[in-house]
C-alpha cells in the first residue's frame, strides 16, 4: 500500500473505531445471521459500507482511521461467533434500551481463522495512504461480557482469549499493521487492583514482541481508582474517554506522573450536539496547560466509537475535531 500520507507529529487525529452503520452493512448482518449469505459474501457486501466510512473520514480530514467496524453487530458477539469454544446466548440488557446476545463459553477457546483482517485490509486499500488502526476487542471485555460454562477459572479463560487475540494480531502484523488497538471498556466496570493486574498479564501475552504502536482503549466508569495499577501496562498509548466525564481524569494523570501517549477523547459520542471548533480547541488547551505530556504524545479523538450517532452528526463532529487539532498545532 502507499504511505504517501504524512501523519502530523503534533496532535494527530484519529477515531476509536466504530462508525454509524451505513449502506448495506446492517442488512448484510441480518442476512448472515439468518444463514442467507456466507461469511465471504457478507464481507464482500459490507465493502460498500466500509468505502463510505473511509470517504467520510477522508472528507473530515482524520489522520489515522478505522474500517468503521461495519460488519460487527456487537464488539463481543462478532468475535464469539468466529472463535472456537463459543455458542450463542440470550438477550441481556446493557443499559437503557440497549441489549446484546451475551455469548456462552461452552468449550476451549481457540482462534480458527482470520476474523477482521479482510475488512481492515480493504479499508487500507482505499485509505489514500492514511494508516488504518487494527482494532480488536480485548480479552478482559470478552471474559466479562460472556457466560463461562466451561472453564470455571477466569485466569485460564482470559489467557486463552489473549492467545486467540494475539493470533489474529499476528495476521495483521504480517500484513504491515502500524497501529494495534485493544478495546477494554469492561475494565472500568470493575475498577479493582486485582482486575487491572489480571488484564496486565493478558496484555503481556497479546503485546509481547509487538513492534507496532500498542494501544488500549478504556472508557467511562471510575478509571481513577485503578490508574496507578495500569500505568505499567505494556502499551504505548491509552485511549481514554474524557469529554463525557468533563475531563475528570486529568488531575489524576498529573498526580501519577502519566507519561505515555494519550488518545484524548474530546467528542461526546452520546450527545447529538456537535461540539464547536472552539469547544474542542479549549479541551486540547486544557490538557496542554496542565503539562502532563507534550503535543507529540496527544492523539485527538472521540471518547468512544461513533456507532450510536446519526451519520451527519458523526461527520460534523469529526470535521470540527480535525479543525481544532489543526489550530492547536499552530499554538502548541
From Swiss-Prot:
Biological process annotations from GO: methionine biosynthetic process; methylation
Enzyme class, first EC level, given as a word: transferase
Pfam family, one: Meth_synt_2
GO molecular function annotation: 5-methyltetrahydropteroyltriglutamate-homocysteine S-methyltransferase activity; zinc ion binding
Cofactor field: Zn(2+)
Cofactor note: Binds 1 zinc ion per subunit.
Pathway: Amino-acid biosynthesis; L-methionine biosynthesis via de novo pathway
UniProt cross-references to InterPro entries, sorted A to Z: Met_Synth_C/arc (IPR002629), MetE_arc (IPR022921), UROD/MetE-like_sf (IPR038071)
The keyword Zinc appears for this protein: yes
Residues given in the record as Zn(2+) binding sites: 217, 219, 241, 304
Keyword vocabulary terms for this entry: Amino-acid biosynthesis, Metal-binding, Methionine biosynthesis, Methyltransferase, Transferase, Zinc
Protein task: Catalyzes the transfer of a methyl group to L-homocysteine resulting in methionine formation. The physiological methyl donor is unknown.
Protein name, UniProt field: Methionine synthase
Species in which this protein is naturally found: Aeropyrum pernix (strain ATCC 700893 / DSM 11879 / JCM 9820 / NBRC 100138 / K1)
Amino acid at each position: 500500500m502507499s504511505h504517501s500520507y504524512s501523519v502530523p507529529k503534533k496532535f494527530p487525529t484519529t477515531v476509536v473505531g466504530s462508525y454509524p452503520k451505513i449502506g448495506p452493512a446492517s442488512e448484510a448482518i441480518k442476512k448472515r445471521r439468518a444463514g442467507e449469505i456466507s461469511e465471504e459474501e457478507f464481507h464482500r457486501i459490507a465493502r460498500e459500507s466500509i468505502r463510505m466510512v473511509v470517504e467520510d473520514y477522508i472528507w473530515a480530514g482524520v489522520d489515522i482511521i478505522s474500517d468503521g467496524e461495519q460488519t460487527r453487530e456487537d464488539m463481543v458477539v462478532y468475535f464469539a461467533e468466529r472463535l472456537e469454544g463459543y455458542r450463542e446466548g440470550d438477550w441481556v440488557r446493557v443499559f437503557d434500551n440497549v441489549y446484546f446476545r451475551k455469548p456462552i463459553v461452552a468449550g476451549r477457546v481457540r482462534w480458527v481463522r482470520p476474523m477482521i483482517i479482510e475488512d481492515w485490509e480493504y479499508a487500507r486499500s482505499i485509505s489514500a495512504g492514511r494508516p488504518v488502526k487494527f482494532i480488536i476487542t480485548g480479552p478482559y471485555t470478552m471474559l466479562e461480557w460472556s457466560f463461562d460454562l466451561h472453564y470455571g477459572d477466569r485466569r485460564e479463560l482470559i489467557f486463552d482469549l489473549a492467545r486467540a487475540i494475539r493470533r489474529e494480531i499476528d495476521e495483521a502484523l504480517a500484513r504491515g499493521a502500524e497501529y494495534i488497538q485493544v478495546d477494554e471498556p469492561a475494565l472500568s466496570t470493575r475498577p479493582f487492583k486485582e482486575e487491572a493486574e489480571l488484564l496486565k498479564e493478558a496484555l503481556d501475552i497479546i503485546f509481547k514482541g509487538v513492534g507496532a504502536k500498542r494501544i488500549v482503549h478504556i472508557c467511562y466508569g471510575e478509571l481513577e481508582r485503578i490508574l496507578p495499577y495500569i500505568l505499567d501496562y505494556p502499551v504505548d498509548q491509552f485511549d481514554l474517554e474524557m469529554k463525557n466525564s468533563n475531563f475528570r481524569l486529568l488531575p489524576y494523570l498529573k498526580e501519577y506522573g502519566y507519561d505515555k501517549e494519550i488518545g484524548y477523547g474530546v467528542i461526546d459520542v452520546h450527545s447529538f450536539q456537535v461540539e464547536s471548533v472552539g469547544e474542542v480547541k479549549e479541551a486540547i488547551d486544557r490538557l496542554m496547560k496542565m503539562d502532563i505530556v507534550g503535543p507529540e504524545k496527544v492523539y485527538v479523538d472521540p471518547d468512544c466509537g461513533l456507532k450510536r450517532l446519526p451519520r451527519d452528526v458523526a461527520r460534523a463532529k469529526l470535521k470540527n475535531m480535525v479543525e481544532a487539532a489543526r489550530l492547536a498545532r499552530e499554538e502548541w
